[in-house]
Amino acid sequence: MHELIKNQLLKKFNNPILKELLDSARLNYKEKLAFTTDSFVVSPLKFPGGDIGKLSVCGTLNDLIMLGAVPEYLSLAMIVEEGLEYATLESIIDSIASTAKKAGVQIVTGDFKVVEKGACDKIFINTSGIGRIITGKLSPKNIIPTDKIIVTGRIGQHGFSVLAKRKELDLGFNIKSDCAQLSDLIIPVLKKTKAIKFMRDPTRGGVATTLNEIAQNSGLGITINEKDIPTSSQVKTAGELLGIDPLYAACEGRAIIVVKAKNAKQILALLRKHPLGRQAQIIGEVTERFRGRVIINTILGTQRFIDMLTSDPLPRIC
């Protein structure tokens, strides 16, 4: 264990706070902070566009970013099944280190446990994050009718990527996960405008479930337009073949942003300047009709309600 800590963890997450190896990380702050935690049990461990290591960093960082916080520190805890190949573990650690370094965050504390075979499935990871809040309070209570809804990129990529890899589906094409940390996309926009009311990342349950949560928490209705929702042809085809609506498939590198109507096009233009925001779209608006519900204007010219996810067709996608 000590050799693993010295040769892998301390070496690859190299920073003076972690090197102290104290029971807690000693941090000095006088500013407003955001603090979050998340656990990751994705199966398979690797998928097109990422792995459990990258996901464990991006997922927690994105939760901080959605609150208007610049991520700074992470904790890392790993529960490893006895018999996991060392090369697999090393690859995951390398992925964590690389993703954290690119994001400019430090892993300053952590834990490592080995459990008997069968007590977990290969490896489970928990990360917690601390970030410095740079905006006013982002809240669903800020939302008013006429506010616009933006999604920052093509939806459903992660959910379908993981499912296809897990089931070894021969779809005739690959679907790459959108797994990415969003600080380089979102933070510059937050620094240039105060017109953002609220943000969420549409992970479990996808865009549909996240929009329903926003509608319920704001006490208002949301109407979206099917023709405006950015969806790749591969995800559309996979959804039709598997009977899964892409609106319910998880994203791990997208944000849903509620903005003032008059600033929506300006914010959209800012997002599109970054590679992760190239396919950003205004997909709908907040209304006073059907409070707490989400309605979609379909490409057939009809309307229907979009409900919360009631069962999970894509378990263990994060």
Feature locations, PLM:
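A generic local secondary-structure boundary/capping motif
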Residues: 14-16, 23-25, 65, 97, ...
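Extreme N-terminal cap/leader segments of soluble proteins
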Residues: 1-49, 67, 76, 95-108, ...
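Beta-strand->loop->alpha-helix junctions that form or flank phosphate-binding loops
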Residues: 16-20, 202-203, 221-230, 248-250, ...
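Small-aliphatic-rich amphipathic alpha-helix that forms the alpha element of a beta-alpha
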Residues: 48-74, 94-102, 184-191, 209-212
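Acidic, Ser/Thr/Pro-rich beta/coil linker or hinge segments at domain junctions
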Residues: 2, 9, 274-318
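Glycine-rich anion-binding loops of enzyme active sites
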Residues: 29, 33, 40-42, 70-162, ...
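Active-site-proximal betaalpha loop/short-helix elements
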Residues: 81-83, 175-251
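Helix N-cap motif at beta-to-alpha junctions
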Residues: 259-265
